[in-house]
């Protein structure tokens, strides 16, 4: 949490932090594969978006990428902290309205590669690696490569289960077993299922007098979460209590 420039609730922060700690013992610079999925359409949710009419794009994109609907935030936040409008939906709608992306998939890839990617996963990995003096470079985000990929027809990127054109270029240069293996993630079970000492730390943070004085979260919601910390999940499958706890821990760490 100390290494985070801003609150980062993704489970993989812990994994990247520990991995960077180990890798930094022998090297100072690593190459990261970040950006390949966003630039070359590697994620599983891109093929369904390719079938969505352009005018329906913002609503369908929001279903995939909006972790907490505005209505749910109204059940979590105290009224003084809740905005009347839905800034997430407005942001997506405005971006999709920008000219230059002919299809829903093109608009989604543009948003992901120019905004979501650099403001979330790239920033996460940069924070976790630099905490150990490790520099992570991102060759898939070379601007000329990104521009070339943006001009590539969507069907070529979606081929072969995603990142099709990239896989074809790599074939013969990279072992097939690497190219065709199932996609891997960095799961952190302790953050998905809160119990024991870790749950105690979460409870201490959200019930701290500083948190109560802040008055960010509704007491009824918080009490329900602490009574049953592992049932409630966000749209994207994260532990709902952990996200609130991480925010509170980060604020307390910064003396805010």
Regions of interest found by a model, annotated:
Residues 17, 21, 168:
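Active-site phosphate/pyrophosphate- and oxyanion-stabilizing loops and adjacent acidic/basic residues
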Residues 39-65:
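A mobile, often basic/glycine-rich helix-loop segment
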Residues 27-43:
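Short acidic/histidine-rich active-site segments
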């Amino acid at each position: 949490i100390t290494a985070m420039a801003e609150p980062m609730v993704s489970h993989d922060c812990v994994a990247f932090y520990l991995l960077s700690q180990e890798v930094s013992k022998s090297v100072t610079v690593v190459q990261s594969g970040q950006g390949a999925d966003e630039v070359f359409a590697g994620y599983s949710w891109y093929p369904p978006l390719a079938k969505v009419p352009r005018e329906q794009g913002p609503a369908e994109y929001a279903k995939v990428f909006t972790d907490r609907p505005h209505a749910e935030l109204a059940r979590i936040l105290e009224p003084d902290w809740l905005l009347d409008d839905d800034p997430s939906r407005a942001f997506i709608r405005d971006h999709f309205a920008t000219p230059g992306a002919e299809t829903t998939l093109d608009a989604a890839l543009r948003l992901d590669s120019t905004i979501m990617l650099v403001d979330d996963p790239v920033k996460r990995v940069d924070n976790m690696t630099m905490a150990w003096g490790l520099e992570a470079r991102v060759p898939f985000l070379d601007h000329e490569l990104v521009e070339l990929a943006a001009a590539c027809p969507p069907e070529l990127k979606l081929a072969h289960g995603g990142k099709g054109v990239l896989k074809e270029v790599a074939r013969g240069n990279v072992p097939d077993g690497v190219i065709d293996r199932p996609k891997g993630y960095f799961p952190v079970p302790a953050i998905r299922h809160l119990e024991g000492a870790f749950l105690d730390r979460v409870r201490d943070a959200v019930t701290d007098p500083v948190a109560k004085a802040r008055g960010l979260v509704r007491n009824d919601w918080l009490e329900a979460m602490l009574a049953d910390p592992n049932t409630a999940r966000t749209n994207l499958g994260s532990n709902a209590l952990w996200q609130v706890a991480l925010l509170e821990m980060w604020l307390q760490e910064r003396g805010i």
